[in-house]
Amino acid sequence: SVSLLGTIVKYLALTMLVPLIVAVVYGDDIWVFGASLMIALVAGIAFERLDPEPDIGPTEALLLVSLAWFGAAAVGAVPYLVAGYGTESTIGLDPSSTGALLGSVINALFESMSGFTTTGATVLGSISVEDHSHAIMLWRQLTQWLGGMGIIVLMIAILPELAVNGAELMQSEAPGPELQKLTPRI
């Protein structure tokens, strides 16, 4: 399952091309996304080559989904770390201290995981292009969009396996005595 995690990391790295293009257009943070893209791409390819023919069963699939969330957060944190956003000034430590480095890693992981889980919490302070580059702001929004799409894909993949259709799900979640189906009319 490590090689499949590498594939996920590799494709997630390719999504950094979008903010890289924005960085080139606006002329800011080009090296941030260039370096982040290369770091994530190399890591993804390296993980992919560890097991060229993965044997995946239900246990490995569960492990892969869990590792994919953490892998996505780690990859998503790289641009924040490279750019230095949400770092020592946010947590009030001396930039040269070990705690500042740990704090910046934690803040970057928090910002990334917040995006991929679509919670919207942030350590960036004010969220505007006056305070942060266009590319970083796009990356923040892109992680939230990817997280939202991930939940939708997960539900589309899992609900049929549980033999639950949309009407049954809605009936179980809707308040009231009974849910009536709509009848299509032409």
Model-identified regions with their sequence ranges:
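Membrane-proximal intracellular helices of multi-pass ion channels
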Residues: S1-I186
